[in-house]
Amino acid sequence: MKTEGIKSPSAKYHDMAGSQRIPHKNPHIQKVAVLQSKPNKEDALNLIKEIAHKVSYLMKENHFKVTNLVEFYPRDQRLLGMNVNHGSKIMLRLRCSTDEFQFLPMECIMGTMLHELTHNLFGPHDKKFYNKLDELIGRQWVIEQRGLYDTFLGNGQRLGGRANLRSNRYPMTGISTNTGIVRKRGKGVKLGSLHPEGISSIDRGNSPRELAAFAAERRYRDDRWCGETKNNKDQIISDNISSSLEVVILDDDDEVLPGDTLIEVIDLT
């Protein structure tokens, strides 16, 4: 079943990319979904599939499993992501809180994804959590430089093999070379980082008191931006499956029933 959506400036590019069967797979994520009520949902779907694709090798190395990776657009404008039941569902904000037509920079969404994957292992924003998050951030950078993905890429690429680096790199803001999605320029905020400009890296020359202050600031920021510490988690999840959205399951044998959830679901396995 197909639904009609608002055509975006990148629709022509998107159709070309689809005809070339550019892979966006991840054997460690069962399904991805985007909000049907928002504009440019095809671009949103391509974006969340790109995120899933890029973390596939990291997830393989760390034995991470995610059942559903979905877009959400919470009422709390500060909220960037949420992990439900250690990977049962990871929800990511893809769009600017003040303009749903604009997508966040890739580095911002990727930072949130790594943060939420860390919640598969650790709940509280404590030292163990941040040690693991920093490890994942550093490892993901190396993986992207080497162009590693845990998926069949076609053209002779094997599971866990390398991809063409030039065709899979993406800029930190602006236009993605894979999807053609126009993303908002400017500074984004990444979960787990002290500054919007980059990954948290504290000078080893700082005093213990300064390091403690940095750590406290990091926890404070993440407690605001991450859904893990929210007292209204059930309400946030409920808002994301409002009856105003329509389910589109990519199986012609299935019928859409009244009252079904609101998300377009794509099987990544």
UniProtKB/Swiss-Prot annotation:
Location of the motif VCP-interaction motif (VIM): 209-219
EC primary class: hydrolase
Chief location: nucleus
InterPro entries to which the protein is assigned, alphabetical: WLM_dom, WSS1-like_metalloprotease
Entry-linked Pfam families: WLM
Effect of residue 115 to A: In wss1-pd; loss of function
Known function: Metalloendopeptidase that acts selectively on DNA-binding proteins. DNA is needed to bring the protease and substrates together to enable proteolysis. Involved in the repair of toxic DNA-protein cross-links (DPCs) such as covalently trapped topoisomerase 1 (TOP1) adducts on DNA lesions or DPCs induced by reactive compounds such as formaldehyde. Involved in DNA damage response and processing of stalled or collapsed replication forks by removing the covalently trapped TOP1 from chromatin. DPC proteolysis enables the repair of the lesions via downstream DNA repair pathways.
Protein name: DNA-dependent metalloprotease WSS1
Natural source organism: Saccharomyces cerevisiae (strain ATCC 204508 / S288c) (Baker's yeast)
